[in-house]
Every structure is written in structure tokens, then in C-alpha cells.
A protein has these predicted regions:
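Short, solvent-exposed micro-motifs at the edges of structured domains
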Residues: 1-242
Length: 242
């Protein structure tokens, strides 16, 4: 779904919302992205249909808002249009742009910490589900991501676990970022100008946490030890157009 405000009064907006669901039996789409999985993740070669589950890249909700806004200050604009030339050179003619993105997380894939049992399988062996995995919403969720980690159990000897390839009842943390910029063109003469920009990636320095350890039996099971988006980055840009 898309909503757009075409450029008027210095403002242009574009908002998109995606609601989707992806199901497959092998999620690899890029050999360079290992977490997508592949035929190598087939747990039981005699029952390949058990691999059918949510795609490991399934993200149900994605909202994105982008905008471009000419600040209404300076010559030819709504406010302070009669300011002296030197003041307009500093205060007038600025433009800001931004992209805001919010999305749900991906379903989690659970494995066994030691690789599982000596059985003829192609890929990682999975645990048993004795309940529904849920996320811990307490203050300690980064160190204890799962509300009840005991709903994931190691299978009995010489058996394979019944957990699906991707579990949708618990997902990786949601995603929120805002990339913003502000800039101005300084006109030198006709068809010649100098452009200055300040850009901020993850402008609000909002932490986007990565996926918790999902290997049942690990000492760090349920712990998140990295972020998937870096801290705020500021960048200055200069461009001479002619």
C-alpha cells in the first residue's frame, strides 16, 4: 500500500506499508547470506516435507516514510524573505530529507548446540517443542530473550526434533531506523553552484538488536550479543555542480 503527497509548498511525502507472509521449504536466495538457509538445512532426508515453514526472511509488517522538505526560510520562501543577502546565505534555502523505516522481526530458527546426534541428516538438527516459544518482555530481555526457554528440549536419543525450520511465535527484535540529512545549494552563477550536505545514518542512535543465540544447550542461549545496525554516523558532503 502506497500513499504519496506530490511536491507542493516545498514538501513531498511517500509512505509505503507492506503486509506479507512467505512460506517455503528452503529459504536461500543469496549464497552470501548464510542465515537464509538452504538444502543443507534439511533435517530429515526421508521427510523433506517437514521443512515447509515460514521463510527465514519472512517479515510480516514493513512501514517506510520518506520525505523531502524545503525549509520555508529565505528569499522566495514564506518566512524572512526580505532578509539581507548575507543572512540568506547562512539561513535561507536549506532543504531536509529523511527516510524512516519500521519493521517486524524475522522468525527464529532453533538448533542443538553440539550439532545433534549421529544420524544421517543433511543439516542442523532441531529441538523438540513442548510449548510455544514466546519473547520475554521484561527489562532483561536482551540477556534473557525467551519467556520460558524450557519449552525447547533436546530430543530423545536417536530421534529428531519436531521444531519447524522457522518458528513464527517468536521473532528477532523489531527494526527502527531514521536516516536524515540537511543541505543547501550556494549559487555562484548561472548553471554553477556549490552544494553542502550533512547526513546522519541512524540519526537518533536507536539500537537495533540482533538475533539471540538459538542453539539449545549453549551457555548463552537466549542472549543477544550484537546489534544489527551500527551507531549513529555523521557524514559531510560537498559537491560542485557546473
Amino acid at each position: 500500500m502506497t500513499a504519496e503527497k506530490k511536491y507542493s509548498n516545498g514538501l513531498q511525502l511517500l509512505a509505503t506499508f507492506v503486509w506479507s507472509k512467505s512460506i517455503d521449504d528452503s529459504s536461500q536466495a543469496d549464497w552470501n547470506v548464510s542465515w537464509l538457509g538452504s538444502i543443507d538445512s534439511l533435517q530429515d532426508p526421508n521427510k523433506p516435507w517437514l521443512e515447509r515453514s515460514l521463510s527465514t526472511f519472512d517479515i510480516p509488517y514493513v512501514f517506510q516514510l520518506s520525505y523531502s522538505y524545503d525549509l520555508p526560510v529565505g528569499h522566495g520562501r514564506a518566512f524572512m524573505g526580505n532578509m539581507p543577502r548575507w543572512a540568506d546565505l547562512i539561513l535561507g534555502g536549506w532543504k531536509t530529507n529523511g527516510v524512516w523505516r519500521m519493521s517486524d522481526g524475522r522468525p527464529l530458527t532453533f538448533t542443538l548446540s553440539d550439532g545433534g546426534q549421529p544420524l544421517p541428516t543433511y543439516g542442523s538438527q532441531r529441538p523438540n517443542l513442548v510449548g510455544t516459544p514466546k519473547r520475554n518482555h521484561g527489562a532483561d530481555w536482551v540477556d534473557n530473550y525467551f519467556a520460558d526457554p524450557n519449552v525447547l528440549q533436546r530430543p530423545a536419543p536417536f530421534t529428531l526434533g519436531d521444531a519447524p525450520r522457522a518458528v513464527g511465535s517468536v521473532r528477532s527484535p523489531s527494526h527502527f531506523t531514521a536516516d536524515l540529512s540537511v543541505g543547501k545549494q550556494f549559487h555562484i552563477r548561472e548553471e554553477m553552484n556549490f552544494e553542502f550536505r550533512v547526513e546522519a545514518k541512524n540519526a537518533f542512535n536507536h539500537p537495533v538488536f540482533g538475533t539471540p543465540d538459538t542453539a539449545v544447550g549453549d551457555d548463552t542461549f537466549g542472549t543477544i550479543n550484537y546489534t544489527s545496525v551500527g551507531p549513529r554516523q555523521l557524514q559531510l558532503g560537498f559537491k560542485f555542480n557546473f
